[in-house]
Amino acid sequence: MKMTMQRVPEPELMDAPDQVQAYSEADFAESNRLFVDQLLHMPSVLQFQTRPVRLVDLGCGPGDICLRLAWQRPDWTIQGVDAGANMLKSAEAAARLQSMNNRVEFKFAHLPDPSLPQQHYQIVLSNSLLHHLPDPSVLWNSIKQLGATGASVQVMDLERPASEDQADQLVQRYAEHAPDVLKQDFFNSLKAAWTLDEVQAQVRAAGLTLEVQRISDRHWIAQGQLDH
């Protein structure tokens, strides 16, 4: 029987000023580029290359994914939501710096948030939010509520390794030169992450038809469409 390190939840919000600064300045280009590339190559998303579409990024953090998409798909209406006020300030500052503040809207929202428009978005995204949530069903149910019929869905997050030693190795491999606060956050996030089997069970329990697969040595991805 395969042994897996026990999950250790971490705080739902990562919004302390030192955490926000370290996270905003960190180099997540590789994983964010992977996320964007995977989305733009989804068959159900290819139809929107030159068509207007409404997209929401749940747990958008400092906004890098929203901004990358805004550059590549100028016809899209892009909204990022997050429950961290300081994180949203960082996202808004990044948008202004790139002269994208009129292209991307950032909004404070704590899921589940009934003020967000229901069945409104053609694309629903989330990257690295699930492991922060005490109840993972909050994300999967929010996706069902916010996405229009046939909406494309993509969720990516860390996968919990089998041991603390493996978590330490991943921190050294990918955050060796990062500030200590970011190293600790990464280690804590790996321990708080869900396994592939756990995510697949969550998706089934939510009644979603998403394909869940491992996509790197530390990430899984879930993709599909809403059929409600």
Task: Write out the residue ranges for each language-model feature.
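N-terminal, positively charged/glycine-rich alpha-helical extensions of SAM-dependent methyltransferases
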Residues: 1-22
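Conserved alpha-helix/loop element of class I SAM-dependent methyltransferases that forms part
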Residues: 29-51
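Conserved class I S-adenosyl-L-methionine
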Residues: 51-61
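Class I SAM-dependent methyltransferase SAM/SAH-binding core
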Residues: 56, 64-113
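A conserved beta-strand element that flanks and buttresses the S-adenosyl-L-methionine
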Residues: 125
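A short, conserved alpha-helix within the catalytic core of class I
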Residues: 133-143
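Short glycine-dipeptide loop
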Residues: 147-152
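C-terminal alpha-helical "lid/dimerization" subdomain adjacent to the S-adenosyl-L-methionine
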Residues: 156-207, 211-214, 221
